C-alpha cells in the first residue's frame, strides 16, 4: 500500500512539474487548449486563448507576459471560437491549425502545402515575438516554413517588415481591429506604396495620411520631420529590385515599445512606463482625430475638443449604440424619423453653425442663400445644403453626409450647415418656459402681433415682387417659375401659334410681358402627360448647360400640365437636314454641322457624367436637337429620360425611343446604360454627315442604309468624300473632321455597349484631343451592306411632327470583337 501511494505521488509530482513549466514550443505531442499557453524563452511574450473585453468569443493571440494584457497578434481574426476548452491549437497535416470543438471544425490554418510529417515540425514563440513554424532541430539548422511576422495584425513590433512586393505590387498591411472587443479586420490600414511612402487608407481605398517618401540622406520620411528627434528607435529602409520594406529596432532593449494601427484610424506609437505601469502615447498620425476619413460614419459629427469625438446631430441616433460604446463609430447615425417627401411642410432644415463642411457634396450655381435653400427644399433627394459666401457656391448633399466636423468657436473658417429633418425632430426653440409676469406676457403678445403684421406685409410685397419678376422672365438664377394656367394662356394668346406636336402634346409659341419669347408644351393624356411632366421637371428642372434646353417654369393645375422653355427660333435639327424641294431653308454648312455634333456631344456628356444622377435621355434623334438663334444645339424633350443613381451602372426599363436610333440592348430587353444614348448619337451623327435619313433612298434610287455604307468605306479605306452631303459641294469641307466624325459614329453603333465610347470620349475625339483608331464593322449592320437587292425599312417615331421615312432596322445580338478605340489606351 505504501509503495502504491509512493508511486502515485511520484507520477503526480512529475505531471505537476511538466504542466506548470513554461514551454515555448508546440510540437506533435504538445497542443494548446483551455488555459494552456506557450511563453518565449526569455519570458517576454506569451501565447494562448484570450477573450477581448466583455466579449464571449475566444481567440488565439499573443501578448506581453509581464505587462497588463496587451494583445499584439491574433491568429483567427476573422473567425472566433465559442469554447476554449474544447478548441485545440496544434500541428496537423504539415500546418499549424485551430480546431473548434472536438477536433472537428478547422477555424484557422497556416495554409501550407507541406509534405513534412507532424513529428518533424514545431511551432516556436521566439524572443522577438515571432511565431515560427519550422522543421525540427536547432534554430540554426531549422527550415522556417511560416512566420507570424509575415502576417502582421494591427501591431508593428521591432523587427517586423511591412514590405511591398514590387513583382506583384501587393503590400503587407497593418489593419486595425473592428472595435475594442472585436479583433476582426477593421476599416483602417497602413501600407507601403511604390513611392516609398507609408499611407493610411480607409477601406483599402481612400488615403487620408501619408508619411511622404523615404529620404535616404536624412533617413526620415519627408512628411515626418519629428523622426530627426527620435532617441528610442533605429529606423531602417531597404529596397531592391524585388521588394521594399521599412523596419526598426530599439536602441535600449530595456525599453518596451510598439506601433499600433488603432481602431481610431490613427497610427500610434506607445512606450511602456514602468514607474506608472501604463502605456504612454509617444506619437500619432493624423494628429487630429477628426482628420481620420469617415471616422464618425454617415451623418456623424466629429469634434476634436469633445469626448467622445463623435456625436449624432439633432434628429439622429447611433446606428448601433453597442458599437459606439466600443468606440466603433463606422456605422454612423440614422434618422429617428424617416423623411416624407410627399408633403414639404413635414420636413424642415436644422441649422448647424460653424461646421467644416462634409465631403461628397455637389455644387449648384446659385446666387444667394435663399435660392440655394429653395433648390434643396424643392428636391426630395436633397438631404442637406450649405452656402459658401466666399465663393458664392451652393453645396448640396443628395447622399449620406460624410466627414462633418464641428469647429471651435474661435475658428472663423466654419460654415452654416442645414440638415433636412422631419419636422417632429426639429426642436421648438421658442417654447423655453413660462413667465408669471403678466406685463411681460402682454408685451410679448403685442410684440408678436406687431412682428406678425410686419412679416405679413413683407411676404405680400415679396410675393408681388416675385410675381412681377416671374412675368418679366427674370429667372437667370436657374430656379423654376410656377406659372398659372391663365398666365400661360395669355402669354400664348390662347394657344394660337402652334409650333408642332407629338405623342405627348403640342408646343406653342408665346411671349412674356418683357417680350421674351417662350415655347410652351401642353401635355395631353392623363397618365402619359403626368409621367412626362414629372420626368422633365425632375431631370432638367435643376440643371443648366449651354447645350441643354432650359426649362424656365411649369404649370400644374389639376389635369393641366404645361412646361415652359426658352424659345428656339431655328427649330429642330431635322428641319434643316432633311429638306424637301419645296422648303426654302439654308443648307447647314459643314463647319456648322460639326459644331452641332460637338455641342450635342457635350450636352450628353454633361447628362451622363456631371449631374448628381446619371441622366439617360433615351430618345436622341435630330427632332430632339433644337437650334437657337446662333444655331447652338440644345438637347431637348426629356419626357422619356431615366435617372440612374451613381451607385448603379444600369437601369431596367420598358422599351422607349425611336426605331432607327435604338441600341440593340433595347430590343433584347436587358438593362440599359448611358451607352444606349451613345448608340443613338452615332446614328444621328451619320445623318449629320450625309444630310439625309439613314434609310433614305440615294439619288440613284437604290436603297442604302447609310451606316453600313459608311462602315464599308471606313473599313476598306474608301473615298470619305463620297459620304458627305452632296449639297455641300463647293463648301469648305474639312475631310479630316469628316473622317473623325464617321469613325466615332461607327464606334458609337457597335453591338456590344462595352465597345462604345463614353460621351466624354466622343467630345475629346471631336475636339481632336484623342486620336481615334479605325473601328470594326458592326455585325448587326453587316447584313445591310449595299447590294443589288432591295431592302425594305420601316420607321416609327415618337414625334408626329417629324419627317418620317420607312425603315425596319433589324438588330442582331451577335457581338463584335473588343478593340481599342483611341490611341491613349482608353478603351471604348
Curated annotation (Swiss-Prot):
Residues 23-439 are extracellular. Residues 797-828 have a biased composition (Low complexity). Residues 286-322 form the EGF-like domain. Residues 461-828 are cytoplasmic. The modification Phosphoserine is found at residues 527, 815. The keyword ATP-binding applies. It is an enzyme of class 2 (transferase). SMART domains: B_lectin, PAN_AP, S_TKc. Residues 582-600 are annotated as: CaM-binding. Gene3D superfamilies: Bulb-type lectin domain, Phosphorylase Kinase, domain 1, Transferase(Phosphotransferase) domain 1. Glycans are attached at residues 85, 113, 203, 234, 240, 255. Disulfide bonds join 290-302, 296-310, 372-394, 376-382. The modification Phosphothreonine is found at residue 653. It comes from the Eukaryota. Keywords: ATP-binding, Cell membrane, Disulfide bond, EGF-like domain, Glycoprotein, Kinase, Lectin, Membrane, Nucleotide-binding, Phosphoprotein, Receptor, Serine/threonine-protein kinase, Signal, Transferase, Transmembrane, Transmembrane helix. Residues 341-422 form the PAN domain. It catalyses: L-seryl-[protein] + ATP = O-phospho-L-seryl-[protein] + ADP + H(+); L-threonyl-[protein] + ATP = O-phospho-L-threonyl-[protein] + ADP + H(+). The keyword NADP does not apply. It is a single-pass type I membrane protein. GO terms for biological process: recognition of pollen. One of its GO terms (molecular function) is calmodulin binding. Residues 23-146 form the Bulb-type lectin domain. Pfam families: B_lectin (PF01453), PAN_2 (PF08276), Pkinase (PF00069), S_locus_glycop (PF00954). It is found in: Cell membrane. Residues 1-22 form the signal peptide. This is G-type lectin S-receptor-like serine/threonine-protein kinase At2g19130.
